[in-house]
Regions:
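Beta1/beta-strand and adjacent pyrophosphate-binding region of the FAD-binding site
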Residues: 25-36
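Core beta-strand elements of the Rossmann-like FAD/NAD(P) dinucleotide-binding domain
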Residues: 28, 257-266
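Conserved flavin/dinucleotide-binding core of flavoenzymes
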Residues: 41, 252, 300, 316-480
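Glycine-rich FAD pyrophosphate-binding loop
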Residues: 47-68
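Dinucleotide-binding Rossmann-like beta1-alpha1 core, especially the glycine-rich loop
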Residues: 70-138
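Active-site/ligand-binding neighborhood in enzyme catalytic cores
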Residues: 145-252, 261, 270, 404
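Flavin (primarily FAD) binding-site architecture
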Residues: 269-287
Length: 620
């Protein structure tokens, strides 16, 4: 009897398990839009987990914004861990980088300099570059959490400043500034278009990575080789399939690409923001996402490969790795030609690329060749042709890579990490630590694939909420004043520092960039402070205002108790008490003589009144 009961229970359990198994056996489906590195990674990871994946790419080829170079410098496992893991997975061999390319070098007026050469032959330029690097390191050190760079109101304020203004304050020599501008353009965008907070955040990410680790080896064939390795693993790829619309309902996502329509459980959107803006989303994206699509800054880059019969540059100038030019040549490196000859890859970035926007490809190449020929007279005779990639004028990309402009971290930080219903987002622009890099694209593809699996498992996905700095925070930012004084060369007079946040727009920023005299002269409001004085005696008001303006130096000792607003208020009550005796003796001339003496007393409360009004502005 007992055995029969157990047998019946076993049959029931088996039936339940069978039903559950049938439900689980239903293969999950996903569509990946975008065949760049991020999309390829997401598709690969989902397929590896048993998903049926369809990848749609608008162009005839895959790999996205891969460069022209037939071999690419890559970092070691410390600098690019995800990239190196995929290289190991696909058994793609790399070649160790020679030592001379592992640090940046320079081409100054056609003369090649290593960092060691620069220190000997142009010590002033070398010293200025070192000073810049040290100051940048101090700036990066202030960001303790790169995933939440605006952790306090002081750092939050850096997002309102562009990098060019910060560089202006460093007073760099002309050549050093040109080289530094070129480096920033190449890695991000024009300094005047780049948020100082974003620049500091990126510097903090790489602060623990030695410059040499960023070019530790070479990948023969470039990133195209890695893209092809992904492609070989994927089962369903549709090229020449530009997506025009995405419709989400309760259980599915439907994608229209050309005349074809595809339906799946979930979707990974792995296209640049400008391309995303051309896709009709239903339900539509909210105002914040649409604002990010339209206004998020992308770096500009034109990449040109000039081909020569023979090397026309100095054979001793081993120009490779990163070589920054102080002229219009931008950043360049020598690219080995696979079939003999010699190639040079030139990157025009930032406003250098924007200026050339009106030029056709051949005109642009001619402009670059003219500059190269000025330094190497054999260039035109040995020149055989060119290849070009113009990311910024490509309607499908609208730029080369993410480069947050002033105020944009405040609005759009980590916005694209959150899935919207059944759609997850990938692409270098969605990665917090390594945007604009191959590493960032690979990481974002992994994250999006993981999010889609979480959504399929029924998990509610909430974004990492980064709370904006609280309003009262500036009052407790005394330690941050030291940070700014070291950054922008302010005086070490600590009592003056709290005046920085007094008026966030005029006073704080003028102080931030070395305008230390401006806040001290700012007792212009002091003229308004004595305005209550006319009530007791209109005549003495004129002599009171004049002395306050003439000796602003006296505000320095008075500002010591600037934080104590209550004692300052007491001094304001003493003013009428002292002026009353002046009323009682109007006829006597002697008290009139004493009146100027009392104006000396009036100066002090007036100056204190100026310091009292400043903290009030901060609170407001």
């Amino acid at each position: 009897m007992l055995s029969g009961w157990l047998r019946a229970c076993a049959l029931i359990v088996t039936g339940l398990v069978s039903v559950s198994t049938l439900a689980d056996d239903k293969q999950r489906t996903a569509i990946v839009v975008g065949g760049g590195m991020a999309g390829l990674t997401a598709a690969y990871e989902l397929q590896a987990k048993g998903w049926q994946v369809t990848l749609l790419e608008a162009k005839p080829s895959l790999g996205g914004r891969s460069g022209l170079a037939t071999s690419e410098w890559i970092g070691n496992t410390k600098a690019q861990p995800v990239l190196n893991r995929y290289l190991d997975t696909f058994k793609l061999a790399t070649v160790p980088a020679p030592e001379f390319v592992r640090t940046p070098s320079y081409l100054i007026d056609g003369v090649y300099f290593t960092q060691a050469d620069l220190a000997v032959k142009q010590p002033a330029t070398a010293e200025a570059i070192k000073r810049y690097n040290d100051t940048l390191d101090n700036l990066a050190r202030s960001i303790t959490d790169p995933e939440n760079p605006a952790s306090n109101s002081t750092l939050f304020a850096l997002d309102q400043i562009n990098v060019a203004n910060w560089l202006d304050r460093l007073n760099l020599p002309a050549t050093a500034r040109q080289l530094i501008n070129q480096q920033i353009r190449t890695r991000y965008d024009e300094p005047s278009r780049l948020s100082l907070l974003y620049f500091a955040q990126q510097s903090s990410v790489y602060r623990s990575v030695d410059e040499r680790d960023l070019r530790a080896s070479r990948l023969p064939g470039g990133s195209t080789v890695l893209a092809q390795a992904f492609v070989k693993q994927l089962k369903t790829i549709k090229t020449n399939s530009p997506v025009s619309s995405v419709v989400q309902d309760k259980d599915h996502v439907t994608v229209k690409a050309g005349t074809a329509s595809y339906t799946a459980d979930y979707l990974v959107m792995a296209v640049p923001l400008r391309s995303l803006g051309k896709i009709q989303m239903t339900p539509s994206l909210d105002a914040q996402h649409m604002g990010a699509i339209k206004s998020t800054n992308y770096g500009w880059r034109d990449q040109i490969m000039l081909k020569f019969k023979t090397p026309v540059w100095d054979s001793k100038a081993r120009m490779s790795g990163e070589v920054f030019s102080n002229t219009g040549l931008g950043m360049l490196w020598i690219e080995p030609a696979l079939k003999g000859g010699a190639n040079v890859v030139i990157n025009l970035s930032g406003d250098n690329a924007r200026i050339m926007q009106a030029f056709g490809d051949k005109q642009l190449v001619d402009q670059v060749l003219i500059r190269l020929h000025a330094f190497y007279p054999e260039a035109r005779g040995a020149y055989t042709g060119y290849e070009i990639r113009r990311y910024s004028v490509d309607p499908s990309t609208g730029g080369s890579y993410l480069a947050f402009g002033p105020g944009q971290i405040s609005k759009y930080w980590r916005l694209w990490e959150r899935p919207i219903q059944r759609v997850a987002f990938a692409g270098e622009h969605t990665d917090t630590l390594y945007p604009g890099t191959l590493e960032g694209a690979l990481r974002s593809g992994q994250r999006a694939a993981s999010q889609v699996q979480d959504l399929a498992a029924g998990k509610s996905f909430e974004p990492v909420k980064v709370a904006p700095p609280k309003a009262p925070a500036p009052a407790s930012q005394k330690s941050d004043c030291n940070f700014f004084t070291s950054l922008f060369g302010c005086t070490s007079d600590k009592p003056v520092e709290p005046a920085k946040p007094q008026a966030e727009k005029p006073g704080f920023f003028s102080r931030l960039f070395g305008g230390s005299d401006t806040p001290v002269a700012a007792p212009a409001p002091v003229e308004k402070a004595p305005e209550p004085a006319p009530a007791p005696a209109p005549v003495p008001v004129a002599p009171v205002v004049a002395p306050v303006v003439t000796p602003p130096a006296k505000t320095e000792p008075v500002k010591k108790p600037a934080a104590k607003a209550e004692p300052a208020k007491k001094t304001q009550h003493k003013e009428p008490a002292k002026k009353e005796p002046a009323k009682k003796e109007p006829v006597k001339k002697e008290p009139v003589k004493k009146a100027p003496a009392k104006t000396d007393d009036a100066k002090k409360p007036a100056a204190k009144a100026a310091t009292d009004t400043a903290p009030a502005d901060v609170k407001s």
